[in-house]
Amino acid sequence: MIQEIIEKKLHSELQPSYLKVINESYMHNVPPGSESHFKVIVVSDSFAGQRLIGRHRQVHQILADELDNHIHALAIHTYTDEEWKREQDGAPDSPMCMGGGH
């Protein structure tokens, strides 16, 4: 449910050429079926001319309600179409959870 909301909002606001939303909650100390830890890979030319912090702020603004109420952790990987073409291995893997709850 949360994953679908993330996908819909990012598609609507950024019109990405590529979008992947990955629920990484299983990598953390949370109950099975949780939707609390996500990784997003967004490729959109709307990021052109923006620094990394500006891109992340834009994603945070789009997902503000979800971040306030549902999402505990969000790994964000943003690219323009040109940057994505140069990216040989795609976005980096997320690290495994080091413990702690939530």
Curated annotation (Swiss-Prot):
InterPro entries: BolA, BolA-like_sf, BolA/IbaG_stress_morph_reg. The keyword Phosphoprotein does not apply. Keywords: DNA-binding, Stress response, Transcription, Transcription regulation. GO terms for cellular component: cytosol. SUPFAM superfamilies: BolA-like. Belongs to the BolA/IbaG family. Transcriptional regulator that plays an important role in general stress response. This is DNA-binding transcriptional regulator BolA.
